[in-house]
Regions:
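N-terminal active-site beta-alpha-beta segment that forms phosphate/nucleotide-binding
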Residues: 1-97
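Conserved phosphate- and dinucleotide-binding cores of soluble alpha/beta proteins
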Residues: 68-163
Length: 163
């Protein structure tokens, strides 16, 4: 995969997240499932802090082969979890029907809303449990490809937001 310089990805992350926060479905949402980004993903760290003042922000925690969702409270309550990802230690969240909007990470996306993850299937198992939430994939332009292989059971994104 292509790599970009830090200043370039920082600028691109800011532009992508500005488009995300202007999205009508995001603006209307009260409970949002985000992810704490890795170095090669759109940087969500400050975005999480910013919006946690106005919305209920959930983050995934890896537990075995699944993701459980926990309430984000503040940066000091994050701890390194699986794969070096910072994970919240806040309250366990199980009211999936209350989730209005999901920001989904991916290695690649296509314009049809298909997503390629990192191969562990965490989101493949999680997303079917949250069918009514609006699902937005966010990615750098080089992660948007012509076609992502998809199976009939794969959950498509409602929209891909990129620069």
């Amino acid at each position: 995969m292509r790599t970009f310089s830090v200043p370039n990805t920082t600028r691109q992350s800011a532009e992508i997240l500005a488009a995300l926060e202007a999205h009508p479905a995001f603006r209307a949402a009260t409970t949002v499932l985000l992810y704490h980004s890795l170095k090669d993903e759109v940087d969500t760290h400050e975005f999480i802090r910013k919006w946690s003042r106005e919305k209920r922000i959930l983050l995934p925690v890896v537990v075995g082969d699944d993701l459980e969702l926990r309430l984000y409270t503040r940066p000091e309550d994050l701890k390194p979890g699986a794969y070096g990802i910072e994970e919240p230690t806040g309250e366990l969240f199980t009211d999936y029907a209350d989730i209005d909007f999901i920001v989904v990470p991916g290695v690649a996306f296509d314009r049809n809303g298909n997503r390629l993850g990192r191969g562990k299937g965490y989101y493949d198992r999680l997303l079917p449990r949250i069918p009514s939430a609006y699902k937005a994939g966010i990615c750098f332009p080089f992660q948007l490809v012509e076609k992502v292989p998809a199976e009939p059971f794969d959950i498509r994104m409602d929209e891909i937001i990129t620069q």
